[in-house]
């Protein structure tokens, strides 16, 4: 888990409210979402893999380019990246990320990132799809590896996704069908966005 900013506040309890000094606790360091689903919800793990006929470094560059997700958003949908403690933005560890719009609010913090191998995004409690009473995503992870048939002349990449969500128990089937439709073309979007230089 990536630590959120922490701090300590020194107070003098002898100070009176008239001085303008108020008691203030430290910024908390806790998991972004509860470890167990709330009552009436179950843990759902949706996974999907794609075989992409592009080099792994280029698939990684596409996956970790903010413009891949920012460009093309139609208002009022919006994707934001806010700087981490080191002043970095984009896909870097500790960067705050939000994808918001009608019927959705996915807000979280980027976790461990290993170049060309792994990317982690952990969602904050309160994130939801369609309704907070139905679908509450908690984590989105991607893994990359060379494709099983990858060669130096014809490179390919296996891209694997895992989305962890707390789902209303009665709506698990609906969620799985929605995810199958939503993610179906993700791999082909990636492939079309990267020029197939190995064919040229």
What do these predicted regions represent?
Residues 59-69, 96, 110, 121-125, ...:
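Hydrophobic pocket/interface hotspot
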Residues 48, 159-163:
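Short, hydrophobic/aromatic-enriched beta-strand segments in well-ordered soluble domains
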Residues 12, 71, 100-156, 164-166:
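Hydrophobic-ligand binding "helix-grip"
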Residues 164-200:
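A conserved amphipathic terminal alpha-helix motif
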Residues 45-46, 78-79, 92-94, 124-128, ...:
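Short structured motifs
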Residues 2-88:
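Hydrophobic ligand-binding cavity/cleft-lining segments
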Residues 33-37, 96-97, 127-132:
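Short, P/G- and charge-enriched loop/turn segments at secondary-structure junctions
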Residues 7, 12-18, 87-96, 116-128:
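Short, hydrophobic/aromatic-rich segments at coil-to-beta transitions
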């Amino acid at each position: 888990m990536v630590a959120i900013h922490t701090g300590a506040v020194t107070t003098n309890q002898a100070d009176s409210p008239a001085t303008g000094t108020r008691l203030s606790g430290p910024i908390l360091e806790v998991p972004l979402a509860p470890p167990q689903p709330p009552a009436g919800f179950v843990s759902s793990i949706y996974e999907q893999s794609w075989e992409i006929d592009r080099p792994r470094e280029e698939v990684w560059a596409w996956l970790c380019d903010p413009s891949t997700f920012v460009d093309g958003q139609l208002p009022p949908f919006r994707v934001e990246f806010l700087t981490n403690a080191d002043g970095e933005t984009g896909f870097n560890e500790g960067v705050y990320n939000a994808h918001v719009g009608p019927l959705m609010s996915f807000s979280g913090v980027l976790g461990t990132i290993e170049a060309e191998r792994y990317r982690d995004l952990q969602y904050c409690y309160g994130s939801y799809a369609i309704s907070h009473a139905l679908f509450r995503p908690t984590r989105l992870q991607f893994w990359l590896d060379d494709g099983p048939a990858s060669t130096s002349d014809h490179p390919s990449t296996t891209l694997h996704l895992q989305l962890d969500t707390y789902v209303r128990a009665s709506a698990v089937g609906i969620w799985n069908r929605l995810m199958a439709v939503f993610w179906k073309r993700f791999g082909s979007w990636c492939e079309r966005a990267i020029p197939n230089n190995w064919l040229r």
